[in-house]
């Protein structure tokens, strides 16, 4: 292989990697079922799943291998694809916080506000101090310290406890 050919190959690889780094795929749940996981991993650096429903979130948390959408999401995460899931605000009290918080997923509501899942039993000031707005979803029996409660008010963070 001569130097010119090698240089062209390197430039093509770099070009494709740059293109992938800047590309995001936005899909509905129905469209996600139809996409090939390999295509997603090779061509996109991030996936935005629009309006996920509660059964899908529960299956993602459980790692259900029967649902192709769940398999695609887990394969994308394994390949290093950033996965952002938007969901309706009304679903927040019912989502499986502990299990979803273990996965490297990003969440937002229908208005684009960031949703942070807090799986611990105690919410302290340190947990709230890093937030600037958005929604913080807590477990059912999470204790909120007084300092954290004050910080929630000053940082424009909305607290939601699970049902």
From Swiss-Prot:
Q: Does the UniProt entry include the keyword Cell cycle?
A: no
Q: Name one GO biological process term.
A: propanediol catabolic process
The pathway this protein participates in, as annotated, is: Polyol metabolism; 1,2-propanediol degradation
Provide the GO MF annotations for this entry: structural molecule activity
- List the lineage, top down: Bacteria, Pseudomonadati, Pseudomonadota, Gammaproteobacteria, Enterobacterales
Family named by the database record: Belongs to the PduM family.
This entry carries the following GO cellular component terms, namely:
bacterial microcompartment
Location(s), subcellular: Bacterial microcompartment
Q: What is this protein called?
A: Bacterial microcompartment assembly protein PduM
As for what it does, the entry says:
Plays an essential role in assembly and/or stability of the bacterial microcompartment (BMC) dedicated to 1,2-propanediol (1,2-PD) degradation.
- A Pfam family that the UniProt record links to this protein: PDU_like
Q: Which InterPro entries match?
A: PduM (IPR030992)
Annotated keywords? Bacterial microcompartment
Its predominant location is other
